[in-house]
């Protein structure tokens, strides 16, 4: 756990949250189970709030997940954010024996999971009958206090419609040129159902590289866990990063999840970027994997 400590111990007070991915395997590479890891970190580093980017709704029965989240909310004294997505990584579904239905079905399951979880947190007892998930006279005591915000991480049209209807927060990756299309789709989905867009807290994940030698900067990045998927990288200078963050702040993004390629970049971000965006809470880097979802 030295890696986590070396990252989290160096963060100033402006960094307020820690985010963990939720995967079971990528071939034979080492992957820690996300709920267990997050629970450990929440106990070991109690000054942060914690969430997942994002939990695959398929991997845990939603009624049990509601109970797990409520328990963690009490143990952490209100420091948990429930990040959910439809699930996408077929390899781990197949390897671990989970059914892998169509994308549309997984998004429908996501919507039902959120509805069921909210029922568990607010009704006592709770009953819910959906196409995919059902409960009958289920108790979730003690219920979470304070209420747990639900974040949905997605750029898919169907899942954005679910986000507009049911989520408290939304996450997708920056920079603005990547973020813009799902942002505009989410705004349109909110308009269509009459929900004020401003009710949803907007968050953005940023991949950042600020090498001392600017000629070493690569504007795109392919994570070893996501072959074939290319991420846009912010950099190479602090001014470049600040400019992109400001563009996202201008459209209402309130919270950032930062993925730094190395500790040198993290230190430069802390010293040269974070003070210039002090009006926005800038969370710590996502540790290890990035998320990608419905």
Q: Which ranges hold each PLM region?
A:
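Internal, glycine-rich beta/alpha segment that forms the wall or movable "lid"
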Residues: 61-166, 180-199, 288
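Alpha-helix-loop-beta-strand connector modules within alpha/beta enzyme cores
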Residues: 31-52, 109-116, 120, 192, ...
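Acidic (Asp/Glu)-rich catalytic clusters
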Residues: 8-13, 38-47, 69, 73-79, ...
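N-terminal beta1-alpha1-beta2 module of alpha/beta enzyme domains
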Residues: 1-48, 148, 259-263, 287-289, ...
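Active-site-adjacent beta->alpha loops and helix N-cap segments on the catalytic face
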Residues: 30-37, 175-190, 263-268
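Hydrophobic faces of well-ordered beta-strands that scaffold small-molecule active sites
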Residues: 18-20, 49-53, 80-84, 150-153, ...
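Short, acidic/polar
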Residues: 1-11, 65-68, 152-165, 218-220, ...
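Active-site pocket-lining/capping segments in soluble small-molecule metabolic enzymes
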Residues: 203-238
């Amino acid at each position: 756990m030295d890696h986590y400590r070396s990252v989290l111990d160096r963060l100033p007070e402006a960094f307020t949250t820690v985010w963990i991915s939720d995967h079971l395997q990528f071939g034979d590479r080492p992957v820690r189970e996300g709920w267990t890891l997050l629970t450990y970190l929440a106990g070991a580093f109690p000054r942060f709030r914690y969430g997942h980017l994002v939990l695959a709704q398929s991997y845990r029965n939603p009624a049990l997940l509601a109970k797990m989240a409520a328990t963690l909310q009490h143990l952490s004294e209100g420091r948990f954010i429930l990040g959910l997505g439809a699930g996408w990584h077929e390899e781990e579904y197949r390897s671990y024996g989970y059914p892998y239905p169509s994308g549309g079905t997984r998004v429908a399951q996501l919507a039902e999971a959120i509805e069921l979880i909210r029922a568990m947190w607010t009704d006592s007892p709770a009953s819910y009958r959906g196409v995919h998930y059902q409960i009958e006279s289920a108790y979730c005591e003690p219920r979470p206090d304070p209420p747990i915000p639900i974040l949905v991480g997605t750029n898919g049209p169907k899942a954005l419609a679910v986000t507009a209807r049911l989520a408290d927060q939304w996450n997708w990756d920056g920079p603005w040129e990547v973020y813009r299309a799902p942002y505009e789709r989410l705004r349109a989905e909110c308009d269509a159902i009459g929900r004020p867009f401003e009710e949803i807290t907007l968050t953005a994940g940023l991949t950042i590289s600020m090498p001392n030698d600017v000629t070493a900067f690569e504007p795109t990045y392919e994570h070893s866990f996501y072959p074939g998927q290319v991420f846009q990288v912010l950099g190479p200078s602090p001014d470049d990063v600040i400019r992109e963050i400001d563009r996202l702040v201008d459209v209402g993004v309130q919270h950032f999840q930062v993925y730094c390629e190395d500790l040198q970049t993290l230190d430069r971000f802390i010293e040269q970027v974070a003070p210039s965006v002090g009006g926005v809470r800038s969370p710590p880097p996502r540790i290890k994997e990035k998320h990608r979802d419905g």
